[in-house]
């Protein structure tokens, strides 16, 4: 693995391919591909390559937290020839009804889990199903440990995995030891077939409500599946959770990058020498308080009006004092 920093990019990270030797031909067909990944809110992302757009679990928030200027618009969708909207399951935080209004403006293909309510528009997929959506887009559905499915999309040779609600859902405050063991077994069984795939980019939950072991599922997924790049999601607005996970969990096989700001983007370039060049397309935001004393260090405020309150926790680890679920409304 190699890390380099250049100007004007904020970050320039090269990730050496961890593909097995017998798959060297598959690596060569992926070279010189460029992706743009955009984070919206919670588990919502888009992945764009040339004139193809993938949208996963788009949600504008319970109270419409996603700012208007960061939302997907019909004007944006019209810039693509192929648009695919993936809905992993029917939980409100993974499905915003607005996605079904887009089809009145542009042609859209919806891919939804087979257990969605009757009448839901889209191509239904159950675990084990596979679809060819176009010459450049193929998709497989895998199991989840909650409702619905997880998706693996092959986009012109680049494999993108979105977990949906696949995770090790242990609730240590509420569950018995037996229930936790059953959840662990179910999660391991769900991950097993995914581990047979070669994954370039994975979006995976790190849910702050689970307490100290909030990252148990993500770490196990990284250990077994070894995606080249993992982006945490489903952190319920707790940006510090995602960034701390990225800081602690990156390893030789997998780079971890946290996208935490509405509309934050990264660019991926799959190079001829088997690396992924990762660059930030939205520069870091540092807001300096107007009240600061010029003789003092700048006061950095949290962007997007999201407060980070670590009172009662060790500054280096927000879960150091408890392995019980953290209630977000406290």
Spans of features found by a protein language model:
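Active-site-proximal loop/helix segments of hydrolase catalytic cores
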Residues: 145-223
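Active-site neighborhood of phospho(di)ester-bond hydrolases with catalytic His/Asp-centered motifs
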Residues: 55-59, 81-95, 111-114, 161-164, ...
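Pre-active-site segment of Zn-dependent metallo-hydrolases
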Residues: 44-86, 97-101, 166-196
């Amino acid at each position: 693995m190699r890390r380099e920093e250049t100007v004007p990019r904020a970050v320039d990270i090269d990730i050496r391919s961890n593909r097995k030797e017998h798959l060297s031909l598959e690596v060569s067909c992926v070279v010189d591909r460029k992706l743009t990944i955009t984070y919206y809110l919670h588990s919502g992302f888009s992945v764009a390559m040339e004139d193809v757009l993938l949208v996963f679990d788009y949600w504008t928030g319970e109270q419409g937290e996603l700012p208007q200027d960061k939302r997907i618009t019909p004007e944006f969708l019209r810039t693509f020839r192929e648009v695919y909207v993936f809905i992993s399951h029917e939980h409100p935080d993974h499905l915003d009804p607005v996605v079904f209004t887009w089809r009145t403006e542009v042609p859209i293909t919806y891919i939804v889990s087979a257990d969605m309510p009757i009448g839901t528009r889209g191509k239904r997929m159950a675990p084990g199903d596979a679809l060819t959506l176009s010459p450049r887009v193929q998709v497989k559905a895998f199991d989840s440990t909650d409702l619905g499915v997880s998706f693996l999309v092959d986009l012109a040779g680049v494999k993108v995995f979105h977990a949906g609600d696949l995770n090790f859902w242990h609730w240590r405050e509420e569950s018995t030891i037996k229930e936790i063991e059953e959840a662990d077994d179910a999660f391991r069984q769900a991950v097993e077939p995914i581990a047979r795939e070669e994954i370039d980019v994975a979006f995976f939950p790190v849910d702050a409500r689970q307490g100290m072991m909030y990252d148990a599922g993500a770490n196990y997924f990284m250990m077994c599946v070894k995606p080249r790049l993992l982006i945490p999601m489903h952190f319920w607005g707790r940006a510090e959770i995602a960034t701390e996970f990225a800081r602690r969990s990156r390893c030789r096989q997998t780079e971890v990058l946290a996208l935490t700001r509405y509309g934050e983007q990264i660019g991926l370039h799959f190079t001829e020498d088997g690396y992924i060049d990762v660059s930030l397309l939205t520069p870091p935001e540092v807001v300096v308080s107007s009240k600061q004393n010029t003789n003092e260090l700048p006061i950095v405020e949290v962007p997007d009006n999201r407060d980070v309150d670590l009172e009662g926790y060790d500054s280096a680890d927000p879960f150091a004092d408890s392995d019980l679920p953290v209630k977000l409304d406290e």
